[in-house]
């Protein structure tokens, strides 16, 4: 099952997480979520200015945010995992590294962990998860904790950054 993910990484700002690590994390998470068919997604690490433009254009909110997800398949519930022919296009995740850095600092955690948290959140959105109410949000956050636990050993490695 190795190599079932095509990950397109766009770095508009430096990343403390190496490309191979991002790839490994997404493959682990997809397996944890039961996705085994070949798929592709893109991850863009960017500035507050860029994510603000996207947020304004697509959500009509003129402010930066931490993460945006643009799913290739629109669904109101988590995607039913079914066998498909060919490669499944999941969509795009965009993360503001400056916002992630500020959030990591405020929470006293490493930037790599905050980036993983935001990326896992974006991935869940690509697969149809949403949080329109408190119960849905709690379920989604619980799933994110599960996904981060699956890569805990990687998160304990520094990835070239200060604690």
From Swiss-Prot:
Cofactors, names only: Zn(2+)
Biological process annotations from GO: rRNA processing
Binding site for Zn(2+): 121, 125, 131
GO MF, one annotated term: zinc ion binding
Enzyme class: hydrolase
Record-listed E.C. numbers: 3.1.-.-
UniProt-listed Gene3D superfamilies: Metalloproteases ('zincins'), catalytic domain
One GO CC term, this protein: cytoplasm
Chief place where the protein resides: cytoplasm
Leader sequence residues: none
Keywords: Cytoplasm, Endonuclease, Hydrolase, Metal-binding, Nuclease, Ribosome biogenesis, rRNA processing, Zinc
Cofactor binding note of this UniProt entry: Binds 1 zinc ion.
Top-level taxon in the UniProt lineage: Bacteria
Protein's cellular compartments: Cytoplasm
Function according to Swiss-Prot or TrEMBL: Single strand-specific metallo-endoribonuclease involved in late-stage 70S ribosome quality control and in maturation of the 3' terminus of the 16S rRNA.
Record-stated family: Belongs to the endoribonuclease YbeY family.
The protein, known as: Endoribonuclease YbeY
The organism of origin for this protein: Synechococcus sp. (strain JA-3-3Ab)
UniProt gene name: ybeY
């Amino acid at each position: 099952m190795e190599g079932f993910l095509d990950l397109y990484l766009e770095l508009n700002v430096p990343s403390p997480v190496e490309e191979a690590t991002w790839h490994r994390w997404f493959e682990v998470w997809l397996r944890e979520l039961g996705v085994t068919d070949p798929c592709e997604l893109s991850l863009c690490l960017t500035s507050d200015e860029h994510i603000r433009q996207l947020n304004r254009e697509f959500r009509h909110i003129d402010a930066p945010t931490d993460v945006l997800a643009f799913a290739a398949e629109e669904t109101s519930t988590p995607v039913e995992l079914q066998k498909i022919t060919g490669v499944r296009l999941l969509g795009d995740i965009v993360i503001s590294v400056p916002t992630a850095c500020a959030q990591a600092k405020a929470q006293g955690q490493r930037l790599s962990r905050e980036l993983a948290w935001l990326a896992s959140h974006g991935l869940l959105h690509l697969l149809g998860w949403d949080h329109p109410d408190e119960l849905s949000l709690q379920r989604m956050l619980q799933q994110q904790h599960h996904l981060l636990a699956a890569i805990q050993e990687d998160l304990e490695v520094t990835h070239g950054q200060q604690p």
